[in-house]
Amino acid sequence: MTDYFDLSGKVALVTGGSRGLGYQMVKAFAAQGADVFITSRKIEACEKAAAEVRAMGRKAGTYACNVANWQELDGLVEAAYAAFGKVDILVNNAGSSPLAPSSVDTPEQLFDRIVSLNFKGPFRLMSLVGSRMMAGDGGSIINISSAGALRPRPSIAPYAGAKAALNALTEAFAFEYGPKVRVNTISPGRFLTDVSKAWNEEHKLNATAALRRSGRPEEIVTAALYLASSKSSFTTGSLLRVDGGIA
């Protein structure tokens, strides 16, 4: 990774930044010179990721937060701005895709949890951070969606619907907060991270994708770096598929 996507002097707020693709993006942003504010539900996991960022010579802040809880998000944003004075890059990465037995057997509690984490929380965070970005020097918001929103299956219907709604929000907020704030979506397929260790071999092979494999972490962080950096200065309201050609 070179300094082509230089983020020196920038501050990135990454939800779900202590593991999986969020953790990979945290490290990539720091490697390009950004300071990072990391949030997830477990402060210990956030601190572990923050220690790695600091070892790279960058500053890191942490905050334990459940993005699904609207009331907690004001505190998260206040903590990030108190730590760094600004947020230049917001990555709405936190998400969950539990399987539902069937539409008729999906419990309301499960449905509400999925929608809150994958749609309602990002809506609130974009509102809070985007308005501050627009009042300041601008910035970049990156929403992490899912190939499931484009290729929905019955077992993930609530999740697919929530992510499809997130895709729509990307376009809406791009217009609301433009021209100073760019808002884009990355739509990932299956990626081999610490989360994938529980997958069986068939799932890892991803035979239904055109590339016949799951992605490597570095294959999504480059997309995130592009959207976070000035190299994407004429890109907003867009959805970037990084899914290996999933069918």
Q: Which role does the model predict for each range below?
A:
Residues 84, 216-242:
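C-terminal substrate-recognition "lid" of short-chain dehydrogenase/reductases
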Residues 18-19:
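Conserved glycine-rich cofactor-binding loop
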Residues 146:
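Residue(s) in the substrate-gating loop at a strand-loop-helix junction
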Residues 101-103, 107-115, 205:
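Substrate-binding pocket helix/loop in short-chain dehydrogenase/reductase
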Residues 131, 174-179, 233:
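Alpha-helical segment proximal to the catalytic Tyr-Lys
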